[in-house]
Amino acid sequence: MVVPPVTRTARPAEVRAGDPGILSTHIHSDGGHWELLYQPGVGNRNPAVQKTLDERLVYISMQGNEIFKLAVRAMEEVALEALAANNLSTSDIDLFIPHQANRRIIDAIGKRLGLDEEQLFINLERYGNTSSASIPIALDEANRGGRITAGDILLLDAFGGGLTWGAALIRW
């Protein structure tokens, strides 16, 4: 196989203050707590066949109280990490869009971050927990509903199985 030499060089991208775009992303995981939230009957080892259905292995297993505590702590920490990386504070957030898993988690994070109701976007009551689609759905709804305007600072914050959590700071 003949591979042509690299003929182009990489160039740095510059995002000027005020330009729309992703300011930063922050992602973490801790497999040491995987048993708190997982789905045992997935993949090649436990495919969805009658046996795994009968043994209820296709359903999510969650230790709710422990997940609540970990989710609130992790989502708060990663939100503060994103803000610190950009020399911002919670008062700079125009809209906080968290993973729409549980109203108690959202309220607890909002309180710990000192956010007011106008800074929170919650659509959980309309759609329920839509899993990994919750933030994109909420972002689209907030945009279409006029809750986001050009130049706004958005903080997206999520937590999920495995355990994983992350935040993205965006200038709209």
Task: Annotate each language-model stretch with its function.
Residues 87-92:
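Short, surface-exposed connector motifs at secondary-structure boundaries
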Residues 1-69, 73, 77, 159, ...:
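Condensing-enzyme catalytic core mediating Claisen C-C bond formation in acyl metabolism
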